[in-house]
Amino acid sequence: MADAKVDSATEISAKDLKEKKLIEEKENGKDATNGKENEENGEPEIDDEDDDEVDEDDEEGEGDEDEDEDDDDEDLGGGTKRGADDDEDEDEDDEDDVDPKKQKVN
């Protein structure tokens, strides 16, 4: 019977602690209901949990971006070929540009 009295005493103190935490959370601007649910489950309140989920999504998104970057690299590869074509055009432009010395042959 002594055990029963101890259990009821711990329950009262646990309730008091929960109430104190709820009051502190209200004063600090935290959502009291979320804290209460976590405390009832015996789990500590963790706000970073949502952030971790976002980080996982970001990591997956980064992987997708890497695939997109690979496509960009292929586009750049095609761009370098065009760059070589542009070099040839510059040579042709040089041929079209006549030196003023050559024009004064008259």
From Swiss-Prot:
Keyword Phosphoprotein found: yes
InterPro entries: Pro/parathymosin (IPR004931)
Localization (cell): Nucleus
Organ and tissue specificity: Uniformly expressed in all embryonic cells at 4 and 8 hpf. At the 20-somite stage (18 hpf), ubiquitously expressed in the developing nervous system, in the tail bud and in the pronephric ducts. Also expressed in some placodes, including the anterior lateral line placode, otic vesicle and olfactory placode. At 27 hpf, strong expression persists in the central nervous system and the olfactory placode. Expressed strongly in the eyes and the pectoral fin buds. In the tail region, expressed in the spinal cord, in the posterior lateral line precursors, and persists in the pronephric ducts.
Gene Ontology MF term list: histone binding
Tagged with keyword Phosphoprotein: yes
Record's keyword terms, sorted: Nucleus, Phosphoprotein
List of residues that carry Phosphoserine: S8
Origin species: Danio rerio (Zebrafish)
Compositional bias per record (Basic and acidic residues), positions renumbered to this chain: 1-39
Family listed: Belongs to the pro/parathymosin family.
Superkingdom of the source species: Eukaryota
Region described as Disordered: 1-106
Pfam families: Prothymosin
Acidic residues bias locations: 40-76, 85-98
Designated name of the protein: Prothymosin alpha-B
PANTHER family xrefs: PROTHYMOSIN ALPHA (PTHR22745), PROTHYMOSIN ALPHA-B (PTHR22745:SF13)
GO biological process, one term: negative regulation of apoptotic process
GO CC list: nucleus
Modified residues (Phosphothreonine): T10
